[in-house]
Amino acid sequence: MDLSQLTPRRPYLLRAFYEWLLDNQLTPLLVVDVTLPGVQVPMEYARDGQIVLNIAPRAVGNLELANDEVRFNARFGGIPRQVSVPLAAVLAIYARENGAGTMFEPEAAYDEDTSIMNDEEASADNETVMSVIDGDKPDHDDDTHPDDEPPQPPRGGRPALRVVK
């Protein structure tokens, strides 16, 4: 049987390396290409077209390493977000502590998926990629922009500790 007729190896290798890293008490980090269609990550944390995501159980909730995509919930800067990454965009998985892991080689199945997704995205209207997860609205509604610098915390003098009995 020709390799092009087989299902992609990436989801199976990803799950195997993930389990292996956890079994060795290492922190699994996922490298994602954010330029590919279908990637839903907090873009403000992306650098040079990539983002590195900590997918350790203590860092994410509802992690799904499916055959077609990686999905989970996580907090970025204290804000809960839902992350969805097609397997075509997963470039590598490695350990934070020592770099052990692997980079994934290109696979024909993902090249086809990416070209199909590009065609669909070109013909589709602009869609909202992110949505509010818990339905809460912001406490204030002002004209601040996400690119503005956050306000500085008030400087009140020396910090103090109290004894609570």
UniProtKB/Swiss-Prot annotation:
Gene3D superfamilies: SspB-like. InterPro entries: SspB, SspB-like_sf. GO terms for cellular component: cytosol; ribosome. Disulfide bonds: none annotated. Residues 134-143 have a biased composition (Basic and acidic residues). GO terms for biological process: positive regulation of protein catabolic process. It holds the Pfam family SspB. Residues 119-165 are annotated as: Disordered. Transmembrane segments: none annotated. PANTHER family: STRINGENT STARVATION PROTEIN B. Homodimer. Enhances recognition of ssrA-tagged proteins by the ClpX-ClpP protease; the ssrA degradation tag (AANDENYALAA) is added trans-translationally to proteins that are stalled on the ribosome, freeing the ribosome and targeting stalled peptides for degradation. SspB activates the ATPase activity of ClpX. Seems to act in concert with SspA in the regulation of several proteins during exponential and stationary-phase growth. Also stimulates degradation of the N-terminus of RseA (residues 1-108, alone or in complex with sigma-E) by ClpX-ClpP in a non-ssrA-mediated fashion. Belongs to the SspB family. This is Stringent starvation protein B. It comes from Shigella flexneri.
